[in-house]
Amino acid sequence: MSGNTTNVHETRAKFAETLQPRIGGNTTKVIRAALEKNEAESGVSEDNDNGSLEKVNVATSPLLTSTPPTISKALVKLYPYLILIDEFLNVVTWTGKNIWSSVLMLCLFITTVEYFETLVKYFGHLAIIAILWGYSLLDNYIEGTLSSSPTLEDIALLMNRVSLKSDILLSPMVNLGTQDIQRLLYTTVILSPIYVMITWLLLPPRSLMLMVGMFLLTYHSPWSKVARRLLWKFKIVRLLVFYVTGLDLGGINKDQGIFATVQKQVKKLASTENSNGVLSDSKPIRFTYVLYENQRRWLGIGWKPSMLSYERTPWTDEFLNEAPSPENFHLPEETNTMVWRWVDKTWRLDMTNDGAIQVPNSKARTSADPSPDEGFIYYDNTWKKPSKEDSFSKYTRRRRWVRTAELVKTSDFDESVINSNRNSAIEQKVEENSTNGLTAEQELGSNKQEKDNAKKVGEPTTEETKEFAEASNINEGEFERISSTDEEVLKSRARDRLAKVLDDTEEKEQSNPTIGRDSKKAV
């Protein structure tokens, strides 16, 4: 080996330093300093020479032990922007602790729109300085928030608040589907001439922008919610919204709320269909619809369904949502595989009013024809202090109506309806024939050869089978399907019908010989 010593310099690879976000300062250092300060105040001091966030042990943060370091780093880097988004949502949704920030935003918007040209002409150069100054204030605010809330629990709570406020902000649009957007687009295109006339004659573009902006910025304000709720009680307002947007936002079909739970169950059933479109469970599913009848006492008039404009409507569901009266109540829309039908013939009054009234065991708990004052719970003028007895201090009352419906598959429903309609139609037709004194020849038809064949074989003719289908309210396509799948049932019903006609003829033969001779000729 050579005696010359060679100095070897080791060069280690280093990762390029990632760009730290400027807003709120260096997030990692700010949070680390806050954690060290909290530890020092709590008497738990540890050496953190390398300054890594992962080596800071915080007793109040159990999430650190279960959260991967990669996720923790991502949350820490996202934390300043979550604070910024949370403050923006506070202002827009009017949910902050200080409501005046939202009011200031509204005033700033109005001033900018009304005096935009003047502001740009005389104060445009100062606007850039104002933006930089606002950014500096925002940077200091975020840095202070990072120092006061440096744990993962604070980040998780902030993410939850941002999620809830985002849902509030987007709540007017989450219920709009693709078809609703298409309908809104068509309506907007059709109303384009009216829009042009309004912007040309009545509202200039600046005024229109001001009105639309104020409506959007104050949509979630408390007084705006109250005003919309009061205006929505007027039918003319609901009709105006319907004709302008083309959307039924609960104004025309006001009973949407009562079907909310039912629609969720129907969607759940539809999702359980297999690849052949057949439900795994063919049993009908029953729903009990509940309507509450509300009345108010008027001096000199008595109990009437006329309610005050700001309170509940004469008919509501159990959640006080507006609902139709029993006479105007209709079942939800049918689907391709499921249909609705009533189990109870009529609406029945719940005499117990959902258990609030004790009913003797000898008395029925429901009644289809109650008296005008049965089943009511009485309240004071503000719907408080419920009582089973009426008194001079009671000015409002309500009672509970129930009716059960069931949801069945289309195939099961068609078979049951067809059979019931067929039986009732056959019985009705035989009764009419017996009343009118028709002979068996007139009933079976004029084709003698086909009647003789039917007599020999003991089966109905094709003409009679079609006649039964028409009597059962079956269309042509349904008749073809039943003719191929349920032919034996039709033939059996026809034989029963023929037997009934012959039995009636024999009975009339004993009472009237003329009818007997005509019947023998026909047979």
Swiss-Prot record:
Main location group: membrane
Pfam families found in the cross-reference section: Pex24p
One of the GO biological process terms: ER-dependent peroxisome organization
UniProt keyword annotations, A-Z: Acetylation, Membrane, Peroxisome, Phosphoprotein, Transmembrane, Transmembrane helix
Phosphoserine found at: S52, S420, S424
Record's compositionally biased regions (Polar residues): 433-447
Transmembrane regions: 91-111, 118-138, 184-204, 207-227
Domain of life of the native organism: Eukaryota
Biased amino acid composition, Basic and acidic residues: 448-469, 478-503
An example Gene Ontology CC term for this record: peroxisome
The name this protein goes by in its record: Peroxisomal membrane protein PEX30
Annotated source species: Saccharomyces cerevisiae (strain ATCC 204508 / S288c)
Source lineage: Eukaryota, Fungi, Dikarya, Ascomycota, Saccharomycotina
Gene that encodes it: PEX30
